[in-house]
From Swiss-Prot:
<dbReference type="InterPro" id="IPR000417">
    <property type="entry name" value="Hyethyz_kinase"/>
</dbReference>
<keyword id="KW-0460">Magnesium</keyword>
<dbReference type="Pfam" id="PF02110">
    <property type="entry name" value="HK"/>
</dbReference>
<feature type="binding site">
    <location>
        <position position="198"/>
    </location>
    <ligand>
        <name>substrate</name>
    </ligand>
</feature>
<keyword id="KW-0067">ATP-binding</keyword>
<feature type="binding site">
    <location>
        <position position="125"/>
    </location>
    <ligand>
        <name>ATP</name>
    </ligand>
</feature>
<comment type="pathway">
    <text>Cofactor biosynthesis; thiamine diphosphate biosynthesis; 4-methyl-5-(2-phosphoethyl)-thiazole from 5-(2-hydroxyethyl)-4-methylthiazole: step 1/1.</text>
</comment>
<feature type="binding site">
    <location>
        <position position="49"/>
    </location>
    <ligand>
        <name>substrate</name>
    </ligand>
</feature>
<dbReference type="GO" id="GO:0000287">
    <property type="term" value="F:magnesium ion binding"/>
</dbReference>
<dbReference type="GO" id="GO:0005524">
    <property type="term" value="F:ATP binding"/>
</dbReference>
<comment type="similarity">
    <text>Belongs to the Thz kinase family.</text>
</comment>
<protein>
    <recommendedName>
        <fullName>Hydroxyethylthiazole kinase</fullName>
        <ecNumber>2.7.1.50</ecNumber>
    </recommendedName>
</protein>
<keyword id="KW-0547">Nucleotide-binding</keyword>
<feature type="binding site">
    <location>
        <position position="171"/>
    </location>
    <ligand>
        <name>ATP</name>
    </ligand>
</feature>
<dbReference type="GO" id="GO:0004417">
    <property type="term" value="F:hydroxyethylthiazole kinase activity"/>
</dbReference>
<keyword id="KW-0784">Thiamine biosynthesis</keyword>
<keyword id="KW-0418">Kinase</keyword>
Amino acid sequence: MSDVDAAVDLAAALGDIDTATPLVNSVTNNVTVNDVANITLHWGGLPVMSDDAREVDDMVATADGCLINMGTVDEDGEESMVVAGTAANEGDKPLVVDPVGVGATPTRTRVANRLLDELDVTILNGNHGEITALAGDDADVRGVESVGEYADIAETALSCARTHDTVVVASGETDIVASPEEAYEITAGHPLMAQIVGTGCMLGVTLATFAAGMENATPLDAALAGTVGFGLAGEKAAEEGEYNGPASYKTAFLDTVAGLEAAPDDPAGRIERVLSVT
């Protein structure tokens, strides 16, 4: 069994999560909070959404993993994110950071850089534009959406991973997962996923749930398994679910995640190592 095969044994990963039932605290935005909570539950985790700086450190201390999502950032929320992330680091809990909209405004860029400077981030999750902005390159981010074209996103994600010493997931038409040593391209998903507000938010907590629930998994293992599982669930929902458009497709997607017990396709066949640092 290759390293990639082992990392993307989706049935084993889902079994681990089902056994562990990891509690994941999400400090997330008020636009997609319900979707983030539901998909945590559907993967087999337990969601909690504490975001008050007065208690979030105590909640994260009892949790198995933590997501910080910058979707709706304000002064109080910024402090809660730092408190939550610090508690995750102190408890050696997996920490996923989703720097939503970084590069769109100076405030978001400052907050994202503060989180990366002050916290030990397990997995950094963003779209192509956000990851490009954090790598210090020119990015086209409009609001919280990536609207540019990023032909060199694998190189950019690898550079970002090396700069911030973390695992990077750069989501888009093709997804890139990069550690400081190597980058993988993942081909999985469906165009309808891009028509749902909050897909990236749901991916972020998916990564946190996999990182918290998979037994003996490295951050790269969790990022690969979570990203390819998320994409394959999107494909399965499109092919087998009942829907009439984006809204009903989202329901079909969540139903598919809830019922997923094994990969509907060969996960390793969807992953290609595209860069390696020797």
